[in-house]
Amino acid sequence: MLPDSEGQKLKTFLLGTGTTLDPSLDPTGNSNFSMATTSDSSTIWTALPASQPGDKDIPTVDLAAISEAYGSTSSTTSLTSSVTSQYQYNSYPQYAMYTSANPANYYQQVTANLRAGTTAFPYSLTTPSYYGSYPVDYTSAAAAYQNPYYTNLRGGTAAPYYNPLNATTAAAYASVASSVLGTDAVNLGTSSDGSTGVPSTVTSFSLKEKKPKVSKKKKTGSCSPGDETYARVFIWDIDDIAVISRNYLASVTHTNEFYARAANSVSHLMERIALNNFADVNEFLEGDITNIEDAVVDETTMDSGPIDNLRGLDVMRRVAPKYSAFRQFYTENSTKNDVAGFKQEQNGFNFELLERVGFGAREATELYQSAIQLQTLPNFGQRWPCAQRCMDLVVEKSKLSAEKYANVVLSNDGLVLGAAQLMISGLNSSVPVENIYSISKQGKESVFEKIQSRFGKKCSFICITSGDTANSAKRLNIPVWPLNSNTDLDKLYSALDNFLLGG
């Protein structure tokens, strides 16, 4: 607290000569006082409230003197009115209030607001203004009033999502939608609820997906079983019945030079038969298929991707006509073998076949001598006739009996070379080309499953083999007839004649 003399000096310095002290001023600062200037007899405040405490940072007398010196009604601005008016239009008060000629006005206003007993909050909380009014409390009535509709910009009224149509317009839209979308009836609604404006009758119609039409060309030349029901199918391994596979002939050539020339002659004959319809060996090896039925390519009107297997679509389109020609060649040769005079002699080659593949008389004679030489090998001389007896019996019983039976052959050398081995050994008359399956690119179990799928689940299967094919058959619960010697073929013939082919 400043002494009385210092306060008097400060007041005299600030007021100058134009200021007079009110006689009611109490130098002690404990009583009420009032200050006035010569320019205006009014004051900012005349007395402090009786309940206002006196322990402030600045003495009452000094604060009153400062207020009297700088306070005048002509320069006083209400902070509440100015700030409130500015806040309604802008985010901040006017900048001119802080840069006025008399800076003390700002502090005077703040001091007045702080000293006032009840000061109104300058920033009024007004209700935010939006494009629509919302109820204060969320009640059912208020919620029902708020309709989720779009505002009609032109008319200013709320319009529903679905505008009700009159009977004529709805019928027109229904007829157009029915003709375009292919639906039987389309109801867009003709009446609406008065409270909400939503059409009371709105029937949704289902859109039918239009799938692209695919016209498939029917497979030609197919000799699949179709609707025929087979009672039993016998699966043969070509290595056990023809005994002229490439692996077998290669092993004979390396182990015994005496049979090397005869084995090479037979291998050359197989290649000549295959090349009768194909350009080279790589072509039918690259385009090898599991079954001759797979060579038929469906012609579609829409583009199709590559076939999901081991060959591409381009390869199949190139070799499909050649497989068709090979099928015809195999069928014609099998038919001639059944005609009297063209039946292949046992332990020899079909000379008609040799002539068709381009062999002359000299080459045919050499092949005949090679066949006689190879007959001295174990299981080679007697295997062909024994296997042919069994397979021919299956075909004969199938023709005479109401039940159907079939022979199926598995080839490790591919479809074309497997068919060539059957033609060389004379077994092609008992095995249609459609019943030859190649296991060179697919596993044996996959081929077995394909055979089962083709002939049906009601058909029983018997596998005649001596190799590891028996293991694959057992895993699929297919009975196996072990074949280790020619004696096993004789036993099989007896079982076929008495039990397995209907007695």
From Swiss-Prot:
Its cofactor is Mg(2+). Keywords: Developmental protein, Hydrolase, Magnesium, Metal-binding, Nucleus, Protein phosphatase, Transcription, Transcription regulation. Gene3D superfamilies: 3.40.50.12350. One of its GO terms (biological process) is negative regulation of apoptotic process. Its EC number is 3.1.3.48. Mg(2+) binds at D237, D239. One of its GO terms (cellular component) is nucleus. Coiled coil: none annotated. One of its GO terms (molecular function) is protein tyrosine phosphatase activity. Disruption phenotype: RNAi-mediated knockdown results in severe lethal arrest at an early larval stage. The pharyngeal structure is disorganized and the anterior tip is thinner. The phenotype is more severe in a pax-6 (ju468) mutant background. RNAi-mediated knockdown in L1 larvae causes a decrease in resistance to heat or oxidative stresses characterized by a reduced lifespan, reduced heat shock protein hsp-16.2 expression and increased reactive oxygen species (ROS) production. It catalyses: O-phospho-L-tyrosyl-[protein] + H2O = L-tyrosyl-[protein] + phosphate. It is an enzyme of class 3 (hydrolase). Expressed in body wall muscles. Expressed in BAG sensory neurons and in other head neurons. The active site is at D237 (nucleophile), D239 (proton donor). It is found in: Nucleus. InterPro entries: EYA, EYA_dom_metazoan, EYA_dom_sf. The keyword Transcription regulation applies. The keyword Ubl conjugation does not apply. Tyrosine protein phosphatase. Acts probably as a transcription regulator in the embryonic and postembryonic development of several tissues including pharynx, vulva and gonads. Required for the development of anterior tissues during late embryogenesis. Together with ceh-34, required to specify the coelomocyte fate in embryonic and postembryonic precursors. In the anterior part of the embryo, prevents apoptosis in cells that are not fated to die. Together with ceh-34 activates proapoptotic factor egl-1 expression to promote motor neuron M4 sister cell apoptosis. Interacts (via C-terminus) with ceh-34 (via N-terminus). Belongs to the HAD-like hydrolase superfamily. EYA family. This is Protein phosphatase eya-1. It comes from Caenorhabditis elegans. The lineage of its organism: Eukaryota, Metazoa, Ecdysozoa, Nematoda, Chromadorea. The gene is eya-1.
